[in-house]
Amino acid sequence: MAEEHNHNHEEENIIWITNEEGKEEAFEILFDFDSEDFDKSYVLYFPAGKSEDEEIEILASSYIQDEEGKQGQLKPVETDEEWDMIEEILATFLADEDEE
């Protein structure tokens, strides 16, 4: 099921996702990237407002952005191969963050 997401350039790292009950929830974007192997764009994000010492669940979706770059559709990750690639990229990202 595709979910709508909005992007406000004043809050560049926040997306708003409408859940199944129709309620909007804020998520912070960890990072996004394009995959040539799967010809898709992906975004990794987590619930906004979590403190640094709380354990967070990082979510991943592929997405299709609208022409203006302000709104789009999140799509579920479809294959194990995509998940493997996302997990590898996330591990590299987290390792790089630890080094800084």
From Swiss-Prot:
Belongs to the UPF0473 family. The lineage of its organism: Bacteria, Bacillati, Bacillota, Bacilli, Bacillales. NCBIfam families: PRK13678.1-4. It comes from Listeria welshimeri serovar 6b (strain ATCC 35897 / DSM 20650 / CCUG 15529 / CIP 8149 / NCTC 11857 / SLCC 5334 / V8). InterPro entries: UPF0473. This is UPF0473 protein lwe1514. Pfam families: DUF1292.
